[in-house]
Amino acid sequence: MKPNVVSADALFEEFRGPLKWEWVAGLGASERRFDEVVVRLASSGADLVGYLNYIHPYRVQILGEREIAYLGSASPDDCKRRIARIVTLEPPVLVLADNQTAPDALVSMCERAQIPMFSTQESAAFVIDVLRAYLSKHFADRTTMHGVFMDILGLGVMITGESGLGKSELGLELISRGNGLVADDSVDLFRINQTTIEGKCPELLQNLLEVRGIGLLDIRAIFGETAVRRKMRLKLIVHLVRKETLERDYERLPYEPLTQDVLGVPVLKVVIQVVAGRNIAVLVEAAVRNTILQLRGIDTYQEFVERHRRAMEHDNGR
């Protein structure tokens, strides 16, 4: 689900400190919001903010040095028409950047049309980068997934599986081996662009890991600051299964890498059988190292198949 609400007032307060901007016009339109249809169709935050452009309506329009020069570089009548056309774009907010001064006609237009206009000394490029990152996250498709989300050897790994298989205990073992916890039990996932899923912990559960028989553990307090992560990009799903499930539902050596769809993005997946005596933490780290190789374009299974093919051709040639 993608949220579709952010008001001009909320946007102003969010970046009042970082962008040091002032509200210079349209003060009565604090509840002005992004168009819901545009938000729903937007593929990323880049679609919702940019330099002044008359063919891209309904987005935050940024007015830097060149844009202000364009608005004032014609005859008085043409300048009025250029400024008046901004109303037809129905921007949720206008942002005056590069320490520019708004023409009186632009301020008057914003007051009449009740379009909020903010002014900042920051560069237009910087403002666009900041707002795109914020809007991409705010309007991202999102879901919640059950499991333990970790940073293992620098890779974002989600550990999933049936209840009672020891996911949290495995997470604790991996933390003791120097890896980091992002979230336990409930993981918030966001699609921040077309190919990237980012996961973080709900605020209520931050730094906490529940282990049966012990209870809640504050990982940050026990292991230190380096044992927790604020967020990670999801690159691998490790799914724990019982022996009978593995034999029934999965191939021993799948010809193609397994993937799982998360918010429309295919994520690499490995399945590990849980039985007494197996060191699951070592297996998970090995799976992560193998995934890192795959992401670099090195596929051990395909290399084995090719090696086997060459051996057969060599034998047939004798």
From Swiss-Prot:
Assigned keywords, A-Z: ATP-binding, Kinase, Magnesium, Metal-binding, Multifunctional enzyme, Nucleotide-binding, Serine/threonine-protein kinase, Transferase
Residues the record lists as binding ATP: G161, E162, S163, G164, L165, G166, K167, S168
Catalytic reaction annotation: [HPr protein]-L-serine + ATP = [HPr protein]-O-phospho-L-serine + ADP + H(+); [HPr protein]-O-phospho-L-serine + phosphate + H(+) = [HPr protein]-L-serine + diphosphate
Region annotation Important for the catalytic mechanism of both phosphorylation and dephosphorylation: where it falls in the sequence: 209-218
GO biological process terms on file: regulation of carbohydrate metabolic process
Stretches for region Important for the catalytic mechanism of dephosphorylation: 273-278
Binding site for Mg(2+): S168, E210
A single MF term (Gene Ontology): phosphorelay sensor kinase activity
One Pfam family of this chain: Hpr_kinase_C
Enzyme Commission number(s): 2.7.11.-, 2.7.4.-
Protein name: HPr kinase/phosphorylase
